[in-house]
From Swiss-Prot:
Its EC number is 2.3.1.181. Pfam families: LplA-B_cat. Residues 38-218 form the BPL/LPL catalytic domain. The keyword Transferase applies. The record marks 145 as: Lowers pKa of active site Cys. Pathway: Protein modification; protein lipoylation via endogenous pathway; protein N(6)-(lipoyl)lysine from octanoyl-[acyl-carrier-protein]: step 1/2. InterPro entries: aa-tRNA-synth_II/BPL/LPL, BPL_LPL_catalytic, Octanoyltransferase, Octanoyltransferase_CS. This is Octanoyltransferase. GO terms for molecular function: lipoyl(octanoyl) transferase activity. It comes from Mycobacterium avium (strain 104).
Length: 233
């Protein structure tokens, strides 16, 4: 049985926007959310941002850049992160079906990105208690986040979304405590696969799989580190 999380059966309007200033994209999200509440379509924005730090509602003062670099405070969940060139950002503006299940929504975004990584040859997992998509730690290296997720739901409509590190500058994360997690690392598809993986290489797959996950065509499965070990035995 296909189990969509969306309240609409119409196709999602996927828009590839190139590079967009963060504040401009945030305003576009709010405009689209207003339109969705008024009966407009579900929309998925796919884009990159010029380099910027953004802080979710739970960001602590000590997690901000120590050098005073400006930070855009947002109304999404989560803590501080970085966006910039080489990172694919997705903002689904989706009307959720009742009863609302935000955890299920986040799991569906994770499922899509886990499948994107798997199709490229990268094994990724969920980490209990932490959102996003992770490369499990090994050989003395910690778990490493390759995709971050931070969302907001208002009037049964989603805003903000996910960021998949493709070939971005990982050094930008060194000035902050990414997502408030000090005992794990940040990585990219390029770093893990040891070959160039650009945003353009994954944007079509991300668009298709996010839509499939939200519509229930791609079901949510178990991807914990424990399940990974068990399946390898």
């Amino acid at each position: 049985m296909i189990d969509s999380i969306r309240s609409s059966r119409a196709l999602i309007d996927v828009r590839r926007l190139g590079t967009v200033d963060y504040r401009a994209a945030w305003q576009q999200q709010r405009d689209l959310a207003d339109a969705r509440v008024a009966g407009g379509p579900d929309t998925l924005l796919l884009l990159q941002h010029p380099a910027v730090y953004t802080a979710g509602r739970r960001t602590e003062p000590h997690e901000r850049p120590l050098d005073g670099t400006p930070v855009v405070d947002t109304d999404r969940g989560g803590k501080i992160t970085w966006h910039g060139p080489g990172q694919l950002v997705g903002y689904p503006i989706i009307g959720l079906a009742e009863p609302l299940d935000v955890v299920d929504y986040v799991r569906r975004l994770e499922e899509a990105l886990i499948k994107v990584c798997a199709d490229l040859g990268l094994d990724t997992v969920r980490v209990p208690g932490r959102s996003g998509v992770w490369v499990p730690g090994d050989a003395g290296r910690p778990d490493r986040k390759v995709a971050a997720i931070g969302v907001r739901v208002s009037r049964a409509t989603t805003l903000h979304g996910f960021a998949l590190n493709c070939d971005c500058d990982l050094g930008a994360f060194s000035a902050i405590v990414p997502c408030g997690i000090s005992d794990a690392g940040v990585t990219s598809l390029t770093a893990e696969l040891r070959r160039p993986v650009a945003v353009d290489d994954v944007v079509t797959s991300v668009a298709d799989l996010v839509c499939d996950a939200l519509d229930g065509v791609l079901p949510v499965r178990e991807h914990s580190p424990g399940a990974r070990v068990a399946s390898a035995m």
